[in-house]
A protein has these predicted regions:
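Non-catalytic terminal/accessory segments
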Residues: 1-438
Length: 438
């Protein structure tokens, strides 16, 4: 079977799973694992990143691919027979959005990533029929930029209001295993899949030379972790919000969620305060805690609607952007979004460090990497109202490169000389990639 035929075979099976889930809402589906065969695993392998960090066994994607057919056949037999053993994940820490704290992530082995992808493809298709439209994180055909646009559109339609900004404290580390299993059992009754998920939840964590076995959490870094997080929050938050919260409100409210980051915009302050009062109790039932310093009520009325006794409008940060009211070029009130100060500073610090550490590399190699870094920055932060911040980052990037090259030569580098260099190696200028809300 060719690669194209294999992909088509998987697509057909995904359609069958979706239809089954639609036809049997609320039913625990017992027979799903039979869809996973060697072709399915091959498609899962194709969808798995090949340049990611290595797990505890040190095996690279290239090494695994050297005997791909044999490895996939062996993986299938072990997964179906129950002999598969989930290896420990390798824990490492990366900076969080503000750059002041770190976020622990767990790196599975490459083979474990492939199997996690295969299982996620099955159960993800089931839950895609249930997830709400206001959930944007780690879902096919959805993105952070769609979430940003949804915030902008909701604010415009409702003329602002009162916004609840929420931060769940160490969400991925505190997901309660018992509650997650209970939630999964309502829709997934297949023993093979549930057994594999249980093995991943119970897999050890290696940090340094220490092996531990956490009794809660689903490590970030795993392929299946974002899906499990979405399933958990769909039940704990999304479904509760739609079924219980919204019907009890006096006026409208809109939620926008991207994984564990979410905000809720209310038309009235009273509704927002009631929601903020009951949310900790709801989360507490499922082992989740709100960060007291980062969860707050933000007055976010459109400026021309702010009363004399109101504090607004305020600002809030979400998905790396600061959101605030401003006047558009056409003279209308809109919500603009600009790179958050913490994200800007962290990105610039990383770029400066890279320039300093790689200043002795060949100029062309430096240029190609810097070009890629700038293009990546524009690809995410290049939205309509953010051009000034892009331009500032571009200018500071040129300064950082100039400073590093001056250290390399141990001579001053005037701007005219830097301009000559940039004529040879032109860094990409700022550009808007995502246009909306003008």
């Amino acid at each position: 079977m060719t690669e194209t035929q294999s992909s088509q075979d998987v697509s057909t099976k995904l359609e069958r799973i979706a239809k089954l889930a639609k036809d049997k809402p609320g039913v625990s589906l017992l027979t799903l694992a039979h869809h996973i065969d060697v072709n399915w695993l091959r498609e899962a392998y194709r969808r798995t990143r090949k340049d990611g960090a290595r797990g505890v066994d040190g095996q690279s994607a290239e090494q695994y691919a050297a005997q791909l057919d044999e490895n996939l056949q062996s993986l299938l037999e072990r997964a179906k027979s129950g002999r598969y053993r989930a290896p420990p994940v390798r824990r490492m820490h990366i900076p969080k959005g503000d750059g002041k704290e770190t976020r622990p992530i767990g790196i599975p082995t490459f083979e474990d990533k492939v199997l996690q992808r295969a299982v996620a493809m099955v159960i993800g298709e089931v839950y895609e029929q249930e997830f709400y439209d206001f959930s944007y994180g780690f879902r096919p055909g959805r993105s952070a930029h769609q979430a940003l646009q949804a915030i902008q559109n909701a604010s415009w339609r409702m003329k602002g209001g009162w916004l609840v900004e929420v931060d769940i404290k160490k969400f991925f580390d505190t997901v309660d295993h018992a509650h997650l299993r209970e939630i999964l059992h309502r829709r997934i009754g297949d023993g093979v899949l549930l057994r594999l998920i249980g093995k991943w939840l119970n897999a050890g964590v290696i940090e340094g030379l220490v092996l531990s076995y956490p009794d809660e959490g689903t490590p970030q870094g795993g392929v299946i972790s974002p899906l499990l997080a979405n399933i958990y929050l769909h039940d704990v938050l999304d479904d509760w919000f739609v079924r219980d919260v919204q019907p009890a409100l006096a006026r409208r409210a809109v939620m926008v969620r991207y994984a564990d980051d979410f905000v809720v915009l209310f038309e009235t302050k009273q509704d927002a305060e009631r929601f903020l009062a009951v949310l900790p109790k709801r989360f507490g039932k499922y082992g989740l805690t709100l960060h007291p310093d980062k969860t707050r009520l933000v007055p976010f009325q459109r400026p021309d609607r702010v009363g004399d006794d109101d504090d607004g409008p305020g600002t809030f940060d979400l998905l790396g952007f600061t959101h605030f009211w401003a006047v558009s070029r056409k003279g209308h009130w809109i919500v603009k979004q600009q790179t958050a100060k913490g994200r800007f500073s962290r990105a610039l610090r990383r770029l400066r460090e890279w320039c300093r550490w790689h200043r002795h590399d060949p100029l062309k190699a430096q240029y190609l990497t810097l070009k890629k870094k700038l293009e990546g920055h524009y690809a995410y932060y290049g939205i309509t109202s953010n051009f000034d911040r892009l331009a500032a980052f571009f200018y500071m990037a040129k300064r950082a490169w100039r400073t590093a090259l001056a250290r390399r030569s141990q001579q001053r580098m005037p701007w005219w000389k830097m301009q000559k260099l940039l004529e040879r190696f032109p860094l990409p200028a700022p550009r808007i990639v995502h246009r909306y809300g003008t």
